[in-house]
Amino acid sequence: MDKPTGLLVIPTPKKEKRTLTSILNEEFKSRGAEYNLHPCHRLDRETSGLIIYAKGKSAQKKIVELFRQKKIIKAYTAFVQGHLKEHKGIIKNPVEGQNAATSYEVIESKKDFDIVKVMPSTGRTNQIRIHFKELGHPLVGERKFAFRKDYKLKAKRVCLHAEILRFTHPVTNEAVDLSCALAQDLEKFLKTPPD
């Protein structure tokens, strides 16, 4: 599924009911589906891009296990404030006391920001956002881990897009290579970044 920005994957404790999962299950039931779709991982509300859903709980458990064993390759596109000193590297800083590692490579440098390919090898909550903040280059649009007033570039949301997922299917053993284009709002930002 290519998740749009602005939707949660699952409900929060605030009981927000309209989530990507609820919308998908309503749609599938209206088409006569006899199963529920279950998310195999999560993306932040503001993050757009690929998310895997499974048909039923047993399929979900198999995919979740692949994530746990780090057998799924994930790649994101991020826009980071300013320009990174190292154009390629690995950030290995703990997140909430747990080991976390994020590989990155600058794909293109714009006037006030870098476009970065990001490959987390662990899946801590907000890992990418925290790691780039710690480098002194928070994501463009960041409000939770940086003060927007401290940075020249503004965006309506965090500029982070889940672009690639690669893994071996747990049942068929076939190679699965998923990708999706950059979200339209991020494409628009690239064409006309705010002053």
What are these regions (language model features)?
Residues 80, 103-106, 139:
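Conserved hydrophobic positions within beta-strands
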Residues 76, 114-116, 163:
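Short beta-strand micro-motifs in enzyme catalytic cores
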Residues 105, 111-119:
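Short histidine-centered loop motifs in beta-beta connectors
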Residues 108-111, 125, 131-195:
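Pseudouridine synthases involved in rRNA/tRNA modification
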Residues 2, 52, 78, 104, ...:
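Residue-level signal for inorganic ion chemistry
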Residues 42, 82, 106-108, 167:
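A residue-level detector for short acidic-glycine micro-motifs
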Residues 1-101, 184-193:
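RNA pseudouridine synthases
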Residues 81, 118-121:
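A structural micro-motif recognizing beta-strand termini
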